[in-house]
Amino acid sequence: MVNNMIKKTLIAISLLVIQQAHAAPVRDLHWSKLANQLFPALVDMGATRAGATSPAERRTRLDACKQETACVLSASLWTDAEIDAVATGAAKAPASTWRKSTVADDGVQAQVARELRGLNSVIQVYGLGTAPRYPLVDGPIDVPGSLLFNGAVKDAIELAKASEDDPALTFDASLRLAIALLDVNDAKDAIAFEPLDMAHNAGALGRSQIIDWKLYRYTAIIIPGIGPENLTMPLSARGKWNVRLAAKRYADGEAPFVILSGASVHPKGARFVEAVEMRKALIERFGVPAESIIIEPYARHTTTNLRNVTRRLIALGAPLDKDSLIVTYTNQSRYIDSPEFTFRNQKELGYMPGAIGKRLSPTELTFRPSPKSLRIDPLDPLDP
């Protein structure tokens, strides 16, 4: 009897060893979600093996580094010629290569090039220590050049190497490195609220399906966040001002929804999310129904406030040929209506997220959203 038990145990162990030897590669669900949010076209290319993928000379270049930190970082960067070649090749891939949400108004070639430039930026900022566009609120956890920073970069390179068989990131080793660099810095802001509409905006999304938009003057009241400069303060004084303005405007009945936009930005390391705190205040202090509120908890700047709000309007099925209403405190309202804001949008986004229309009061401007706002841009990996 004992011999039979030993025999059965040995057989079970043998079967387990065989099963493990033939097991599928391990998929990191966090990495998969982050890569899909930041680099959807590159993920699609790796999944289908269609169009141009990573050039063979890149793999040779990386293999020659033997995991040496400076070499791996340098070899992982995409040259302009490589970006052009891969983007041009991607444009020739079958339409079935791409998910509907991957390709924006300017096409596959532009999207792939945008993602590769964004990938370079992640490696430069989080790997090489290049200053980000907004150094006061963005960038790695540790000071570039410090022992902690250098150690984190080395760890990221090893983590990326250990993940080379991850089926979600097969496009190129640089994609795994970029995600690893973000991961070791706990830079997961871009997916912190996903699935956003189904998990956090489900009530409003359901209501939008039965809305008769013609009954309203505006599709939504847009409220940009005003972050506090204090880590312990959930909502700034101007944020509270904006919430009151929103409540008054909603009570007029001219818009079916209030869209609250703002992430946890100021100061660096803040944990209170502007959109979430404003939603809480609207419900608890002013009695605005939850199903009339949409949160947009990713925008880190006024430019992306309007870009991301446009994305939420499109998700709601709101008509883009109808005005929405931006309501915010006077200084920010003046800024949104200024040539400086137009210039900043063109410089940072490459387009205007919509048309700024009539000024109705010192705190109110009309806004007509643009579908250009659907372009994913990982140049800001915390809010693409």
Q: Where in the sequence are the language-model features?
A:
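Residue-level detector of alpha-helical transmembrane segments in integral membrane proteins
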Residues: 12-13, 355
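Sec-dependent signal peptide recognition
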Residues: 4-12
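Hydrophobic h-region of N-terminal signal peptides that target proteins for export
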Residues: 14-22
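Generic secretory/membrane-interface signal
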Residues: 13-14, 236
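Long acidic/mixed-charge intrinsically disordered regions
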Residues: 6, 23-24
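A structural signal for short, hydrophobic/glycine-enriched beta-strand patches
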Residues: 24-384
